[in-house]
Amino acid sequence: MQLHRINTMDLKHSLRDLCMNPRHTSWAAPLLILGDAVLCALIIWRVPYTEIDWTTYMQQISLYISGERDYTLIKGSTGPLVYPAAHVYIYNILYHLTDEGRDIFLGQILFAILYLATLTVAMTCYRQAGAPPYLLVPLVLSKRLHSVFMLRLFNDGIAAFAMWVSIFLFMNKKLAAGVIVWSTGVAIKMTLLLLAPAIAMVLVLSLSFGPSIRLGFLAVLIQVLFGIPFLRNNPAGYVSRAFELTRQFMFKWTVNWRFVGEELFLSRKFSLALLALHLLLLGLFVATVWLEPSGSNLPSFLQRLIQRRYRTASLSKSFVMTAMLSSLAIGLLCARSLHYQFFAYLACATPFLLWQAGFHPILVYVVWAAQEWAWNAYPSTNASSLVVVLSLAAQVFGVLGNSFSRKHLDQSSQKEHMQ
């Protein structure tokens, strides 16, 4: 009886160590990726491809190949070209690789490789940030994420890959390379602009103000270089189409705000309220979570920065990853409208953010599962859209609240030490 009890305790200890000890991620990650590769093959083999934008992409590329450089005249069956120039160049390559877009099967294989590459980089970031192995499992179980990459062939998959590569580079202090890859991602789809506030903080904390400004100019220069063929022809048309910020979203496609009703969704007041919330949350994160490595409050930090007396901080990999993913989550929470393909950016970020929020592993899985259900509900419902917003709120306010809790504990321990 006692031996059985000891064996049970040993088993529990071993299972806990397997789930919680970060050293196990070095072998767990390759096994999960290998298993997911098999799953990808099964999906391509068994699940029918769904045509949404691929044909339109190919029609637009056909016009580009024929010599059209006026962005306002490049269109397809489902609408005009509304993505920056790097999207055109990448799908131009895919156009030629897939027999002008006709070889869908090859396209799916290429996107499966892209998916596995994205997953590999994301898991590498998790491992370097010291995340426990149990967080890796949800990364390979997302039905919607597999769909975005392999069954839809959306450009969001390519942009998500660029996002994770840039996060990896910033974590490893390859700041210039990180800026180049991130800006290239923005030139595929400007959703990656949501990471800009955190990237600015990482650069300023790591390099101070002057060098950060230079890297900011580098990011802008990359956008100009990508856009040159179109800027020469119709600069206003290119900028207005590729970086349109005033687009009117359709209520029937929204994943996140269906529960507020169409009248409120379409109102200018709602749009301004979301913008105000976005700015407020960014301000809170700058003043608390993202400023933590500087060891000072916001006024003194700004004063030292202006007076050029700021000493650069050494940023942990976990901090960099948290900053960039929380900036993404804030942007998605306050987004005017989310569509299903946006899950390409969020899917691999959620487990890490919930862990950084200090949630119990069971709660991490509950919130993750609820979010996965909500993003798989088609069409979206009042209930599913509410869960989308609440799960994002859990990530954003969880990270913010955990940061406040840590600061309070640190202050309390310092007082006890002084006494």
UniProtKB/Swiss-Prot annotation:
Catalytic activity: an alpha-D-Man-(1->2)-alpha-D-Man-(1->2)-alpha-D-Man-(1->3)-[alpha-D-Man-(1->6)]-beta-D-Man-(1->4)-beta-D-GlcNAc-(1->4)-alpha-D-GlcNAc-diphospho-di-trans,poly-cis-dolichol + a di-trans,poly-cis-dolichyl beta-D-mannosyl phosphate = an alpha-D-Man-(1->2)-alpha-D-Man-(1->2)-alpha-D-Man-(1->3)-[alpha-D-Man-(1->3)-alpha-D-Man-(1->6)]-beta-D-Man-(1->4)-beta-D-GlcNAc-(1->4)-alpha-D-GlcNAc-diphospho-di-trans,poly-cis-dolichol + a di-trans,poly-cis-dolichyl phosphate + H(+)
GO cellular component: endoplasmic reticulum; endoplasmic reticulum membrane
Membrane topology: Multi-pass membrane protein
Pfam families, alphabetized: ALG3
Covalent S-S links between cysteines: none
Transmembrane feature ranges: 25-45, 78-98, 104-124, 148-170, 179-207, 213-231, 270-290, 315-335, 349-369, 384-404
Ranges per topology, Lumenal: 1-24, 99-103, 171-178, 232-269, 336-348, 405-419
Membrane topology, Cytoplasmic segments: 46-77, 125-147, 208-212, 291-314, 370-383
The protein's Enzyme Commission number: 2.4.1.258
Keywords: Endoplasmic reticulum, Glycosyltransferase, Membrane, Transferase, Transmembrane, Transmembrane helix
Matches recorded under InterPro entries: Glycosyltransferase_ALG3 (IPR007873)
Gene Ontology terms: biological process: dolichol-linked oligosaccharide biosynthetic process; protein glycosylation
GO MF terms, alphabetically ordered: dol-P-Man:Man(5)GlcNAc(2)-PP-Dol alpha-1,3-mannosyltransferase activity
Pathway(s) the chain acts in: Protein modification; protein glycosylation
Compartmental location: Endoplasmic reticulum membrane
Family: Belongs to the glycosyltransferase ALG3 family.
PANTHER family found in the cross-reference section: DOL-P-MAN:MAN(5)GLCNAC(2)-PP-DOL ALPHA-1,3-MANNOSYLTRANSFERASE, NOT56 - RELATED
Record function comment: Dol-P-Man:Man(5)GlcNAc(2)-PP-Dol alpha-1,3-mannosyltransferase that operates in the biosynthetic pathway of dolichol-linked oligosaccharides, the glycan precursors employed in protein asparagine (N)-glycosylation. The assembly of dolichol-linked oligosaccharides begins on the cytosolic side of the endoplasmic reticulum membrane and finishes in its lumen. The sequential addition of sugars to dolichol pyrophosphate produces dolichol-linked oligosaccharides containing fourteen sugars, including two GlcNAcs, nine mannoses and three glucoses.
Protein name, UniProt field: Dol-P-Man:Man(5)GlcNAc(2)-PP-Dol alpha-1,3-mannosyltransferase
Record gene name: alg3
